[in-house]
Amino acid sequence: MQKLIILLLVAAVLMSTQALFQEKRPMKKIDFLSKGKTDAEKQQKRSCSDDWQYCESPTDCCSWDCDVVCSG
């Protein structure tokens, strides 16, 4: 009976450590992907034509002026 309890405890520890490692892996991927260019650097490469372009934030516009559509 004691051997069974020890075996179950070891299995529980192994499963919990595996779960911890799996939680940390996506965070590393996110950190790797987020170390890209800044918004300003990304905008320099795309064509800056804000004519009637829908936006959600100022970073979506070349003019950095967003009010449902880019203006400026």
UniProtKB/Swiss-Prot annotation:
Where found?
A: Secreted
Which residues are part of the propeptide segment?
A: 20-44
Keyword check for Disulfide bond: yes
GO function terms (MF aspect): ion channel inhibitor activity; toxin activity
Tissue-wise expression: Expressed by the venom duct.
Residues with PTM 4-hydroxyproline: P58
Q: Which residues carry this modification: Serine amide?
A: S71
One GO cellular component assignment for this chain's record is: extracellular region
Q: What PTMs does it carry?
A: Brominated at one of the Trp residues.
What Pfam family is a match, any one? Answer: Conotoxin
Task: Give residue numbers for the modification (4-carboxyglutamate).
Answer: E56
What is the disulfide pattern of this chain? C48-C62, C55-C66, C61-C70
User: Where mainly located?
Assistant: secreted
Q: Which UniProt keywords apply?
A: Amidation, Bromination, Cleavage on pair of basic residues, Disulfide bond, Gamma-carboxyglutamic acid, Hydroxylation, Knottin, Neurotoxin, Secreted, Signal, Toxin
Signal peptide segment: 1-19
Matching InterPro entries: Conotoxin
User: What is stated as this protein's family in its record?
Assistant: Belongs to the conotoxin O2 superfamily.
UniProt free text on domains: The presence of a 'disulfide through disulfide knot' structurally defines this protein as a knottin. The cysteine framework is VI/VII (C-C-CC-C-C).
Put simply, this protein is called Conotoxin Gla(2)-TxVI/A
Source species of the chain: Conus textile (Cloth-of-gold cone)
